[in-house]
């Protein structure tokens, strides 16, 4: 995305956090990042927020964007089909569209009122040439 001219607030490399102990250890960083994003949303005239994966953090960011009437395209939507549907209402309310990476997710989200579109899985584009 950066190569296409999108301004990144933070790179995915710094947000790849798995496991409760790692999240707790990175909590001060995540809180500072959330404050930074809130300030940017308030002061920069941002047109679109594209959160990528990481629902533990990004679900709060989509709420911030929604309250400021900033459009949200959530790429790699939360796996509510696996972890429970409690996030669907917020996704419906706070996103303009979801870019989903598994074919079945498009129908799953659409039947629940979300504007979803299957865009393919980024790893499949990389793996397919290896198998040929």
Which residue stretches match the model-derived regions?
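Active-site and donor-binding regions of nucleotide-sugar-utilizing enzymes
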Residues: 1-131
């Amino acid at each position: 995305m950066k190569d296409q001219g999108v301004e990144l607030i933070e790179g995915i490399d710094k947000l790849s956090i798995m496991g409760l102990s790692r999240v707790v250890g990175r909590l001060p960083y995540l809180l500072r990042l959330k404050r930074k994003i809130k300030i940017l949303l308030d002061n920069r005239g941002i047109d679109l927020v594209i959160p990528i994966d990481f629902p533990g953090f990004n679900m709060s960011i989509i709420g911030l964007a929604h309250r400021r009437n900033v459009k949200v395209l959530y790429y790699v939507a939360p796996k509510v089909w696996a972890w429970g549907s409690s996030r669907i209402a917020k996704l419906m309310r706070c996103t303009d569209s979801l870019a989903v990476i598994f074919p079945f997710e498009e129908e799953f989200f659409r039947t629940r009122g979300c504007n979803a579109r299957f865009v393919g899985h980024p790893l499949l584009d990389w793996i397919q040439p290896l198998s040929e």
